[in-house]
Amino acid sequence: MPLSLIAGPANAGKVELLLDRYLDALDREPVLIVPNRSDVEYVSRQLIRRRPALLGGSIDTFDDVFERIAFAGGAARPVVSKAQRALLVRRVLAAAPLDGLAASARFGGFADELLRTLGELESGLLDPGELAGDLAALYAAYRAELDRLDLWDRDLLRRSAAERLQSDLDAWHGEPVFAYGFEDLTGAEWALLEALSARTDVSVSLPYEPGRPAFTSLRRTAEDLQRLAAGRIEELPPRYSEVAQPALAHLERALFADEVHEPVAVDGAVRFFEAAGARGALELVGEELLALLRTGVPAESIGVICPSVERLRAPLETAFGTLGIPYAVDGEVRLAQTPFGQALVSMLRFAWLGGSRGDLFTFLRSPFSGVERRAVDFVEGRLRGRAVQSPDRVVEEGERLHGRPFPAVAELREADDPLEAVRLLTARMLRNAYGLEAPPVGEASRLDLRTYETLNRLLTELERWRKLAGELSRDDVASALERQTLRPLRGDEPGRVAVVDLLRARTRRFDIAFVLGLEEGSLPRRGSSSPFLDDDARRQLDERGARLQRPDSVSRDRYLFYTACKRPLERLYLVREAATDDGSPREPSPFWDEVQAVFDVEDVRRWTRRRSLSALTWSLDGAPTERERLRALAELAANDPGGADALARANGWERRLERATSAFRRPTKLTHALVLEQLGAKATFNVTELERFADCSSAWFVERFLSPRSIDAEVDAKLRGSVAHNALYKFFTRMPKELGVEQLDERIAEDAVRLMRACLDEALQGVRMDMTEMQARELDQGLWRDLEAVVRSECESELTLVPRRFEILFGGERAAPELQRGLDLGDGLSLSGKIDRIDVDPFGARGIVQDYKSGKHAHSAREIESELRLQIPLYMLVLRDLVGLEPLGGLYRPLAGERKARGLLRASEGETLKGYSRNDYLEEEAFWGQVDRARETARVLAGRIRTGDVVHDPKGGECPAWCDLWTICRVPRA
């Protein structure tokens, strides 16, 4: 008997008519086929509203019908689950000679794409012999492995059911079939419908109007169903206007239509939202949702429809969670996206797959590890501070710092049975999180329990697979866990706004709907093709009835968008991102323009609402939450302080407003009594500290007093300088003994270079930081290039002074007794520091100080004074007053670049100090005058520090572009 087709536009009453006929046939045990499992309960409620009790019939998905037919035949095989099927494909790929595909097969996405392609081929009822090349070989190997294990996958079950229905009279007993919500039928589904229509009454509902561009993607399905119906076609007229607002009914008829329709008044039934960024768009939607909920609109009657739930999941959770909007996402969630699953997968990745330090601490930081959060922070901070990265070193050092082992790591690494290890770990994780005194209650706890149950089911599936197929590796278990999804969440929970994608929205009904993603690139979506089956191959296989060709992405999204616009009965909101988060403009989707074109321009403008990137707060009246009202109050305080104060007093927000407005004031002078007491008691100052204060007192306050530190160790200029100084110290202290000289010359240059190589190796071994091989090589080669050049330049130097003293500390307890008092600055203040090197006249008590610089630049005599560089002038006073040598000058020695030494030299000693820049030699009066001014500058700077005199005073009057401290000192930046 032929199939019956019910066709018509959206909301023409097709499904209602189908449900009525289903109820009329209850005495014949009818079967109603719906698209998704989540639709079963939704349709059940619709039927219960029509008839209080249903005493017959069933509501199934296509999979349910296929299973019923296949398993009733008696020859059915066990069906592999998704996880087992993925493991089977991994096994096939491991054994197959991939030839040209070997490079691609290394990546996990290769197996996933092959799985999808094999599913399409089986759904198209194709055999390996109908294909060619590597795909045919892989398909044949896959089928052979299934046969060897005496298993079916889901698609083979479908194929078997379709074949049984075509050949076995007992496969179906005359129950009428009703189906809706299927626009793209696979080969197996089409074979089932064909076979059923030959044996019983089959009624199919299809949204379709011939000739309308909105239904172009359904043309093939409609034509095939019409041919199968053989004239039994009911075309229903448009009826959306009977239940929906006039503007919505007008949109249904005019959207993507070739003929021109007279515009009707919008009257608020269609509204347009534009905002900057995904977060801004969702906050605009959230504000409107709150307003609707507060007016009494039931949350379950509102739907948020988006092209992809996955892409918007994170900003959606942030925006809706901040505003306190109850919502439910209709769709699958990967196990690794749940807190419980993320902790577990991270732990397995670290223990079994050589994961990173971050993977281990993702687990340890979770409530499921059983380790105190404070202890985790301490251990991770120390490991990051030493850049410990390799898994073994992370465990070794982490357990040493923690004082006890991490049991999960050892148990997983030593486990003989990966499944039992995961089962024990998950049970312990749940106990750690909840124990006996904190039973799992609340939404978060329910999610943890759902995840735990899903894991147990998966482990049971994997155990069955191991019994069938043999060994199961740790990699297999970890891969299965990462791919596992939780059972789909319902998006129609009472009291919650439903969040659905375009595909799931087809069978839903709302009073109010928000359609998101109406910017170019989001809708229509870019098409994707399989690397295994291109369009030409699909076209050729379709000639054999495989039904592998899919409509192009534009026509498909056009239909889905048309359907989404017909979901609401009262109001439709269209939402687009007018700009990115960084302000770059985004073009609207063509679908956005199509909707606006069916209404009057002025009407569209009236019902368009925009939120610009600069709109950091809502208006005070429209702020949806107290937090946003407080932010709006702070903005009001900038323009109307009196009004803001009055509002704050009326609502008890005075302290909050004061705290917010004080953030705009930038006082710098230190006033706290304890801080001033600490600074006032300070009598000794390091020379580099004074130089930093001279550069900018605010920068000094942040760097030297607050002293924030980066938690992650890096191979930076500071580390390079430390290693270079250490290597130079070792070199010059060992030179007299190992080279037999006090001064280098060209005759021993090669021996000196070899000694420097040994000293650098020792200095590198002393680095208390775990570096990667690349980092270690880069540091070694960069320093070796510079230090070798320094040694060779020393060998070529005409300087007759001999390097005698190195790393001379003064002004501290670790200094020599005669140097501990430091350099007297006057007013009871003294200077501390460390001189890198002193070169001495072998025939007299004279010398020069040398200060190594790891960079390329050295300060000239003029720059020393103009830029307030104090080291060389003050070090020369230390040389004279504490060391007891007459200073001939001081030099900065850059270790990189041209390595040209610059500094402050006495012109009277030009014969002794040859070869330096002419401008660095000063006459006696100028030389000692500059030195004395440096001492006075140091005294003044030290005095300012003691009184807490911190201001915004960057050298030159403007903050340098490279300074990154402005976020703390709060200096406005362009």
Indicate where each model-derived feature is located.
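Short beta-strand or tight-loop elements
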Residues: 268, 300, 493-498, 560, ...
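Short, contiguous acidic/charged loop-to-helix segments that flank catalytic cores in large enzymes
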Residues: 446, 465-468, 487-490, 547-553, ...
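Metal-dependent nuclease catalytic cores in nucleic-acid-processing enzymes
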Residues: 505, 552-572, 862-896, 945
